[in-house]
């Protein structure tokens, strides 16, 4: 069901919080690094098995000097300057993460509407599309109080709609969404988590 009610958020950002774009950048960067898959990985000459014995003596053979069969010049040797699948991490304190989420949520305060989830007997994308209000072409974030499997599966095929639990809210979907829907049950959870007061 859709309820044509907008929320008023009774919280004013102080002057310091209004200029904390760097905190939003750090929070978004931390999340993107945490979900990135570092797939490409090559081994250096030190990581290749074997190559401990010198192939031939240093002088007197007429051949080029060689100290290991695992040199990058050799077939079966290591790779010089290849990609290294080393995961990069960026630490973000808990207080910083909550403050960044609050700032992003406050920036989206004019895009918030109350939309309560319908009751579904079984997952169906067609049914949920008929029951929900017309979806805009721009992304919509739907914040719910709990994870309903039927509702989650029904909305999975809708590209412009993303569902998230209120207790798992973070910066990226708030910045991604052009419109935000919140269920009635999710309001007290958000008020407690973000330390804001919302009123219909």
From Swiss-Prot:
It is found in: Plastid, Chloroplast. Pfam families: Ribosomal_L4 (PF00573). GO terms for molecular function: rRNA binding; structural constituent of ribosome. Residues 45-71 are annotated as: Disordered. GO terms for cellular component: chloroplast; ribonucleoprotein complex; ribosome. SUPFAM superfamilies: Ribosomal protein L4. It comes from the Eukaryota. Residues 51-68 have a biased composition (Basic residues). GO terms for biological process: translation. Keywords: Chloroplast, Plastid, Ribonucleoprotein, Ribosomal protein, RNA-binding, rRNA-binding. Part of the 50S ribosomal subunit. Probably binds the 23S rRNA. Belongs to the universal ribosomal protein uL4 family. This is Large ribosomal subunit protein uL4c.
């Amino acid at each position: 069901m859709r309820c044509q009610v907008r929320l008023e958020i009774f919280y004013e950002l102080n002057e310091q919080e209004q200029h904390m774009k760097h905190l939003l950048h750090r929070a978004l960067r931390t999340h993107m690094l945490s979900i990135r898959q570092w797939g490409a990985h090559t081994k250096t000459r030190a990581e290749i098995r074997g190559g401990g014995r010198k192939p031939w003596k240093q002088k007197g053979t007429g051949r080029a000097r060689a100290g290991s069969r695992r040199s990058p010049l050799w077939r079966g040797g290591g790779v010089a300057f290849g990609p290294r699948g080393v995961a990069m991490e960026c630490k973000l304190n808990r207080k910083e993460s909550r403050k960044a989420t609050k700032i992003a949520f406050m920036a989206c305060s004019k895009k918030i509407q109350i939309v309560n989830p319908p009751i579904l007997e079984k997952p169906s994308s067609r049914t949920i599309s008929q029951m929900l209000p017309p979806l805009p072409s721009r992304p919509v974030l739907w914040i719910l109080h709990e994870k309903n499997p039927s509702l989650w599966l029904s909305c999975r095929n809708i590209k412009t709609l993303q569902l998230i639990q209120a207790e798992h809210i973070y910066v990226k979907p708030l910045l991604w969404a052009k419109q935000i829907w919140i269920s009635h049950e999710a309001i007290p959870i958000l008020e407690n988590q973000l330390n804001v007061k919302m009123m219909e």
